[in-house]
Regions:
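Contiguous, often N-terminal, cationic amphipathic patches that form binding interfaces
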Residues: 2-67, 73-78, 82-111
Length: 111
């Protein structure tokens, strides 16, 4: 497992973003805040990212918005993004195929 440092606006010095690279897929934790004023990466939440989404947490809309948002930010197809766990929770484990841990780190740095 590879741990990458994170330097977001809400970064906490006691945590580092934990990114796992296994079998061609990168996975990390995302904390989703639905019904926000805009879609954005806010910063770090424990060992993952905190993402605000405008979509409500109803009828899978927040999950679909998270798929689109991450695919857009990482420039991958929607099929490359998968919620590995936490589909009905605000804290999710996301798996993305076709990206490197370094690319995920770049995403965090430029949020």
């Amino acid at each position: 497992m590879l741990e990458l440092p994170f330097s977001g606006r809400e970064a906490s010095p006691s945590y580092a973003m934990r990114v796992t690279d296994r079998d061609g897929a990168v996975s990390f934790t995302v904390r989703v805040q639905p019904r926000a004023s805009r879609d954005e990466i806010v910063g770090e939440y424990q060992e993952g990212l905190k993402v605000r989404l405008t979509a409500p947490p109803v009828d899978d809309r927040a999950n679909e918005a998270l798929h689109r948002f991450l695919a857009s930010k990482l420039k991958v197809t929607l099929a490359a993004v998968r919620i590995a766990s936490g589909e009905h929770s605000r804290t999710k484990r996301v798996e993305i195929r076709g990206v490197s841990p370094a690319l995920v780190q770049t995403l965090c740095e430029h949020s």
